[in-house]
């Protein structure tokens, strides 16, 4: 039997979340963000489920788009960081990948690299995040260059990204939305601004195309709301099993550094999962896992391959019992808060040795 640490991906949850997105953004096209191996959920598992149900897949780079094509998936892909060299343009157009242009070097490469077919492009404009994107006053010149380039498809899109959408009260959100909506340069056939948080909090930002990421996988983009609050279902269940159980005397120290001990006899379960699998090492006291229909607290330090749980009050738990580290019952948002991070990071840091099932 192989090591029990695994990811269980729920296609029905993925489709439920997509339905929720379409309910929140009726009539809008959907670009499903599947960068970083579909936020750790596995592009092999996710892309075939969404194929034909969305407008396009959003990826970070050419390699991620090619991995989707290798699955036999025909839905278009958009390279959100565009190309990193002029050589990538020919590969992109041959595979019908659209490219985001966000700086002058990319535009120059495109204008100076004749292509056999028209390539679809999106122009990214900086409205306040100050990370990627052309300045607003540069857009007229950019559009002029694209419209005169014979190997650029005329369905040019315009997009921007909100810096603070996960904090809806921040005034920067409406400032960015207003700046974007005020852009009146002709030639842009479709517009996009809304990520997961904006889809939920700023309906006026939905424009023509929305770009859900984290909410597609059943995780909240907000610190003060979880997936259940938003009607989302977690797609990823991070699972393992109990590999050993020990009855310890009073004051027995558990784990590295002996950071946990009980003043009474204790029953300690060992779970086959640790930070080598992507579970966070630094978590707050009494962070739970789910065993036999209840929460059980982690005790002691998380190690590379194992963590330990307090079974003193749970005599029915046995070796081999299934353990949910996060997922349907223990939401990843809760573990992220305990670890002082965000759900995005935890999903994306699952290690390669964890198998998908």
UniProtKB/Swiss-Prot annotation:
Pathway the protein acts in: Amino-acid biosynthesis; D-alanine biosynthesis; D-alanine from L-alanine: step 1/1
Binding site for substrate: 131, 304
Enzyme Commission (EC) number: 5.1.1.1
Residues recorded as bearing N6-(pyridoxal phosphate)lysine in the entry: 35
Highest rank taxon of the organism: Bacteria
Reactions this protein catalyses: L-alanine = D-alanine
SUPFAM superfamilies reported for this sequence: Alanine racemase C-terminal domain-like, PLP-binding barrel
Cellular component per GO, a single term: cytosol
Active site: 35 (proton acceptor), 256 (proton acceptor)
CDD domains, alphabetized: PLPDE_III_AR_proteobact
GO biological process, one term: D-alanine biosynthetic process
UniProt KW keywords: Isomerase, Pyridoxal phosphate
Named cofactor requirement(s): pyridoxal 5'-phosphate
Pfam families for this protein: Ala_racemase_C, Ala_racemase_N
GO MF entries: alanine racemase activity; pyridoxal phosphate binding
Known role: Catalyzes the interconversion of L-alanine and D-alanine. May also act on other amino acids.
Cross-referenced PANTHER family: ALANINE RACEMASE, ALANINE RACEMASE, CATABOLIC-RELATED
UniProt record similarity statement: Belongs to the alanine racemase family.
Name of the featured protein: Alanine racemase
Protein species of origin: Legionella pneumophila (strain Corby)
